[in-house]
């Protein structure tokens, strides 16, 4: 029985030791969990700041884009103001209006050309639905089928983009 008590006591000591080790391990794991939870909070906070920064960046870019458009329009308006004022002066001094209007017309045309505006050729050209809008057709002896007989309203290209189609009358053989 004495031996049993010793074994029991040893077993109890081992159990006690194992329990202490497990408690120590549990404490370590709890500390590890706390550290990981703190890391998760930090990452979440960082991610939220990044998201807010990105949203602010997007808003700033949209604002900048609107400002660029506004400034581009302002630059064009400033160029057109000279032409506008010249036209106003020509109207006020009608005695030499034809010469004045011709100068204004050339100045206005040159300003638009410098901004990238060009006319779309039409009369005598082959009809192209990407450039021209046919509103009339006519059988005409002087033109081949599909050739533009008359330009009713001029079309324009701004840089490489069509901004106004030419309105035309096209030859259509019967």
Swiss-Prot record:
Belongs to the GrpE family. One of its GO terms (molecular function) is unfolded protein binding. GO terms for biological process: protein folding. It comes from the Archaea. Homodimer. Participates actively in the response to hyperosmotic and heat shock by preventing the aggregation of stress-denatured proteins, in association with DnaK and GrpE. It is the nucleotide exchange factor for DnaK and may function as a thermosensor. Unfolded proteins bind initially to DnaJ; upon interaction with the DnaJ-bound protein, DnaK hydrolyzes its bound ATP, resulting in the formation of a stable complex. GrpE releases ADP from DnaK; ATP binding to DnaK triggers the release of the substrate protein, thus completing the reaction cycle. It comes from Methanothermobacter thermautotrophicus (strain ATCC 29096 / DSM 1053 / JCM 10044 / NBRC 100330 / Delta H) (Methanobacterium thermoautotrophicum). This is Protein GrpE. The gene is grpE. It is found in: Cytoplasm.
